[in-house]
Amino acid sequence: AATWTCMNEQKNPKTNKYENKRLLYNQNNAESNAHHAPLSDGKTGSSYPHWFTNGYDGDGKILKGRTPIKWGNSDCDRPPKHSKNGDGKNDHYLLEFPTFPDGHQYNFDSKKPKEDPGPARVIYTYPNKVFCGIVAHTRENQGDLKLCSH
C-alpha cells in the first residue's frame, strides 16, 4: 500500500519554536477510515465528515483566487454539485475526514470538546466513497490543506 508523507509544523513545548514534522500515513488505513465514516456532510457530533470545497462553490465554479487540488482521478477532479444540505439527489462532491499515522478511527460523534482531528484528512467522493488522497494543514491544525506526497 502507498505511504503518504505530510509535512506539518508543530510547536515544541520546550523551545516554544515551530518544528517541521514528517507525518506518515498508510493509504489502506486512510481508505478504511473513509469507509467507516458516515456518508453525510457535517451531520455528526464532531461535524466530520464534511464537504471539502477544494476551492469551488456548490455550483462547481472556482472561487476567486483559489486553485483546486488535482487528484489525477476523474471522479475526484470533477467540479462539485453541492446542494444546501449536501444530500440532493444529484449531488456529488468531496468529503474530508480525519486520518492518523497510527490508523485509528476518528470518533465522529464526539461532541464538545470533540476529539482532536489532528492535521491530516482523507479526501473521498460523495456518494461513492472513491479515495482521492490525503491532505494536511501545514501548521498545526490551521489554515489551508495541502496535498501530501506519495
Set out the residue ranges of the language-model regions:
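Short, surface-exposed binding/anchoring microloops in extracellular/periplasmic proteins
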Residues: 2-58
